[in-house]
Swiss-Prot record:
It catalyses: GTP + AH2 + S-adenosyl-L-methionine = (8S)-3',8-cyclo-7,8-dihydroguanosine 5'-triphosphate + 5'-deoxyadenosine + L-methionine + A + H(+). Pathway: Cofactor biosynthesis; molybdopterin biosynthesis. Catalyzes the cyclization of GTP to (8S)-3',8-cyclo-7,8-dihydroguanosine 5'-triphosphate. Pfam families: Fer4_12 (PF13353), Mob_synth_C (PF06463), Radical_SAM (PF04055). It comes from the Bacteria. The lineage of its organism: Bacteria, Pseudomonadati, Pseudomonadota, Alphaproteobacteria, Hyphomicrobiales. It is an enzyme of class 4 (lyase). Belongs to the radical SAM superfamily. MoaA family. The keyword Nucleotide-binding applies. PROSITE patterns: MOAA_NIFB_PQQE, RADICAL_SAM. The keyword Protein biosynthesis does not apply. GTP binds at residues 28, 77, 111, 171, 273-275. [4Fe-4S] cluster 1 binds at residues 35, 39, 42. This is GTP 3',8-cyclase.
Length: 343
């Protein structure tokens, strides 16, 4: 990926501001919808993935990300699916890291299930990645296999070990699942904090058909927080990493605990994020079906002006917020899966 321009600070005329005055500075990009696990709250076991020919090339993803950086994005997170299963994805990460060197980008990071981390951790650090999120819902090997349908937790643990050895800061993301891992959260938190890792808890979101009712999985984090407050001293902290989590300090462990609550207390009022799928579809809101095709303008011209115009039109339609609903009749609020949208 040579010959691609480097960027400097976005001019005010290019910055993205939505109709509600929110400046867009955070881009999440799904580099693939594929994953080597099948977490039951995320996708069905017999998930049909997109034809590889439908995906943007790595060069196109680089150009698209660079266009958003030119328009004021300061934080870029690569997601999936599982981003590290995309062939040659490290060449994309290394190329995007040039924007860290110019100062146009403050942070380049990714969310991963950890299965490939042992292989890539050192190279990620070498590319300028400083911290990563690892999705891990349990410490129990049998329960991990149940949730992921076939995953080996030892691979994830080896990946976390490799990431910390490489000097990467690791944050653990865990989806709170009713009657499955909710009573394990204290031990998961103490384990994470004991290894100098923050833990962020996430409510189940009604995205995509998974073949079962999410009402059976959904646990309001307000209930879980109240339960934890009976065991630990939780002190609110104003410590945002640019995402939707609200953090507390756990006095007994000294660590941070985050809550992402799209169902019980959405985070729309401060939303600074948009998402791009691996096919070049721009979603300005996680909870709405509305989307804009960026692949067409990307391929229509070697220049970026048409792409900028399409992005600006989409940002101008960004909704004020979403209202997710867990439907007992097993109908998702949003038809697309999180693995396609970019988790």
């Amino acid at each position: 990926m040579t010959g691609l321009s480097t960027l400097t600070e976005a001019s005010d005329s290019r910055k993205m501001v939505d109709p509600y005055g929110r400046t867009i500075s955070y881009l999440r990009v799904s580099v693939t919808d594929r994953c080597d696990l099948r977490c039951f709250y995320c996708m069905s076991e017999d998930m049909t993935f997109l034809p590889k020919a439908d995906l943007l090339t790595l060069e196109e993803l680089d150009r698209l990300c660079s266009a958003f950086i030119a328009k004021g994005v300061r934080k870029l997170r690569l997601t999936g699916g599982e981003p590290l299963v995309r062939r040659n994805v490290m060449s994309l990460i290394r190329s995007l890291s040039r924007h860290l060197g110019t100062g146009a980008l403050n942070e380049l990071t990714l969310t991963t299930n950890g299965s490939q981390l042992a292989r890539f951790a050192a190279e990620l650090k070498d590319c300028g990645v400083r911290r990563i999120n690892v999705s891990l819902d349990t410490l129990d090997p049998a329960k991990f296999r149940e949730i992921t349908r076939w995953g080996d937790i030892q691979k994830v643990m080896a990946g976390i070990d490799a990431a910390q050895a490489a000097g990467l800061a690791v944050k653990i993301n865990a989806v709170a699942l009713k009657n499955l891992n909710d009573h394990e959260i204290p031990s998961l938190m103490e384990w994470a904090h004991g290894r100098d890792m923050a833990l962020t808890l996430i409510e189940v979101m009604p995205m995509g058909d998974i073949g079962q009712s999410r009402a059976d999985q959904y646990l309001p984090l307000s209930m879980l927080r109240a339960r934890l407050a009976g065991q630990y001293t939780l002190t609110d902290v104003d410590d945002s990493t640019g995402g939707p989590a609200r953090y507390v300090k756990v006095n007994e462990t000294g660590g941070k605990l985050g809550f992402i609550t799209p169902m019980t207390h959405n985070f729309c009022e401060s939303c600074n994020r948009v998402r791009i799928t691996c096919t070049g579809t721009l979603h300005t809101c996680l909870g709405h079906e509305d989307a804009s095709d960026l692949r067409r303008p990307l391929r229509a011209s070697a220049g970026d002006e048409l792409l900028y115009e399409t992005i600006d039109r989409a940002i101008g339609l960004k909704p004020k917020g979403h209202d997710f609903i867990i439907d007992r009749h097993n109908r998702p609020s949003v038809s697309r899966h999180m693995s396609v949208t970019g988790g």
